[in-house]
A protein has these predicted regions:
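Transmembrane beta-strands of outer-membrane beta-barrel pores
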Residues: 20-28, 51-53, 67-73, 91, ...
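Surface-exposed strand-loop-strand hairpins of Gram-negative outer-membrane beta-barrel proteins
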Residues: 24-46
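Membrane-embedded beta-strand positions in outer-membrane beta-barrel channels/transporters
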Residues: 44-48, 82-88, 124-126, 171-173, ...
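Residue-level signature of outer-membrane beta-barrel architecture
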Residues: 49-54, 89-93, 129-131, 135-137, ...
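Repeated loop/turn-to-beta-strand initiation elements of outer-membrane beta-barrel proteins
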Residues: 56-61, 94-102, 133-141, 182-187, ...
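Detector for outer-membrane/organellar transmembrane beta-barrel domains
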Residues: 126-221
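Outer-membrane beta-barrel "beta-signal"
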Residues: 242-243, 267-280
């Protein structure tokens, strides 16, 4: 209905993307005791299709549907199939590469995991303001609101919720990109998020007393439990994209995260992923 309601002058361009890659995470379960930390790697697949509508010379709307999958080497309960969609609106305040822009987006998805404790629906809202300062350098800052609705409630403790993956959070970020050449683009992003986080560990009294949801998490072992608590996560991310041709690229990202949670609990994780992306 949204597409049909767009006025006649809008021109549409079909979009089709596909990607395949690998990822590694040093602390998948976000544990804070070294004996409980679990690392793993996965193969990732993704595809998206949709349309871009040029509403005017300064406004554009992109509507896409997407599917993604992650297949883990050791912890098969994390294997994922996700389906979703995104609406993204972008307005440019003027002509030329130096004119600033604003971006608004809304996305929703359903994530189905092999271990059904993680099955959930997600909603994300994002707003961004950015500017290209030179032909090779741009920067932006923005904010996100995330809501995840858990599909299953499996409490491990009486009178305490088992919907560990029923989460909400807000974040702010700043990012920048620099085109070293026609082929190589480098990027960096800093973000801070405040909201619900999940840590999976063996039974632990310190985390138990500050948690508001607890459930058994057999993905990581029969004696592991997932705990939901409040926390602040600081993230630093570095990216590099190498254009192979007009339609494909090889993309690398390294991410470092530190979370300070309730009760003085602190955990860190490092992740890296390499993705081949193709666009029609």
């Amino acid at each position: 209905m949204l597409v049909a309601g767009i006025s006649a002058p809008a021109t549409a361009e079909w979009l089709l993307d596909a990607d395949a890659g690998v990822l590694y995470d040093s602390n998948l379960n976000r544990a804070y005791e070294s004996a409980d930390i679990r690392a793993d790697g996965a193969v990732t697949l993704g595809a998206a299709g949709g349309s871009y509508f040029a509403l005017s010379g300064a406004d554009g709307l992109t509507l896409t549907a997407n599917a993604r999958s992650e297949i883990y080497h050791r912890f098969h309960g994390l294997n994922l199939l996700g389906l979703g969609g995104t609406a993204l609106y972008r307005h440019k305040f003027g002509l030329g590469y130096a004119a600033p822009w604003i971006l608004l987006s809304a996305s929703a998805s359903h994530d189905n995991y092999r271990d059904d404790i993680r099955d959930s629906d997600r909603v994300e809202l994002r707003a961004e303001l950015g500017k290209r300062f030179t032909e090779t350098f741009d920067a932006a800052f923005g904010g996100r609101f995330e809501r995840r609705y858990a599909k299953n409630d499996a409490p491990a403790v009486p009178r305490i919720s088992g919907k560990v993956f029923d989460l909400r959070g807000r974040s702010a970020y700043v990012r920048a990109g620099y085109a070293v050449s026609d082929q190589l683009l480098l990027g960096a992003e800093l973000a801070v998020r405040r909201g619900d986080v999940v840590a999976t560990t063996r039974r632990d009294f310190e985390i138990f007393v500050v948690s508001d949801a607890i459930a058994a998490d057999p993905t990581f072992g029969s004696d592991f439990f997932a705990y939901r608590l409040r926390g602040t996560t600081d993230t630093a991310k570095l990216t590099a994209s190498w254009a192979l041709d007009d339609r494909s690229s090889l993309n690398f990202a390294y991410t470092d995260e530190r979370t300070d949670a309730a009760g003085g609990i602190i955990y860190r994780s490092h992740s890296a992923n390499l993705v081949y992306a193709w666009r029609y």
